[in-house]
Structures are given as C-alpha cells and as structure tokens.
Amino acid sequence: AKVWGKTGSKLYGEKSGHDFADNQDRFAMFCHAAIKAPAALTELGFGEDVVFVANDWHSALVPVILNKVMKPAGQFTKAKCAMTIHNIAFQGRFFPQPMATYGLPDSAADDFFFEDGYSKVYDETNPAKEDGKEEFDGKIYRKANWLKAGFMNADKNLTVSENYAKEIASSK
C-alpha cells in the first residue's frame, strides 16, 4: 500500500514505544486528511455537517485547522470538534516550527507556544531524568504544545472519565 509516498513503511513509528523524528509532520498530514475526508466521501452523505472527535496530541490539530483555516474560508462552518485527553503526560511538545509547516496561518502561533527553562523537549526518544531534576541554565526556551492548541480551539474538551478530569485539574 502506498500512503503519501511511504510505500511499505510504518506510518506512525518503527516499533512500539519509538517515535519518528518527523512525527509532527506525519500527524499534521493526518489531521488535514481527517478534516477533508467527510466532504470527499460523498457516498456517506455527511458533507461538511459533522462533529470531529480529536484524541490526544496526535489529532489536536483538527480543531485548530477547523477554526483557523476551514471556517474562515467558509468551509465546515457548521462543524464542531470535541477534544479528548487520555493521558496528559503526552502533550505533543516540540520546538517551534513556522505555522505554514503545518498548513496553518501565523495567527495560530499563540495557541501553541509556551516558554520554560528547559533546554530540551522530552519525548520517548529523549526522556527526562528519572529524578525529575534538570539543570537550568538561566535561559528561557520557546516551545510548541499541540495539546494546548487543540484544547484552546475545541468546541468541547473531554477526558476519559470524571475521575481523570478531577485528577488532572487538581494541584496535586
């Protein structure tokens, strides 16, 4: 099967627990395709009158694309998007890229960006130290958080359970 020029390769990772270095590009492509699918699959009869359900950071661009690209262009004007979080530890944090890289206008940038004192972005291939202690060098680093952007643009934000909602909302 051929998937966007990737013949015979695994689209989301080489093996369980390991990310591709370009996952943000892959998932941006996935999110654009997810939005365009209902209108393209005319035999289903949905057109643009749909509710999208985005799950975790991997699909967090869906509500962003919907609000920043599609609706301003007069497309999917009735569509809604619910954003569901399954594990808040995985937020899709990356070093910033130009918004155009993901097919988004520059005006979307503020929804993604945050600053912290860590010189790294931690993920499965670059985990934080076990003791949770990192050295601060006194600098501030700008980063992007896809889950944050998804939450800011979703029509409804959900968690997998009422208890999980309470757990992630607590300061403990």
Question: What label would you give each PLM region?
Answer:
Residues 1-172:
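Catalytic cores of nucleotide-sugar-dependent glycosyltransferases that transfer UDP/GDP/TDP-activated
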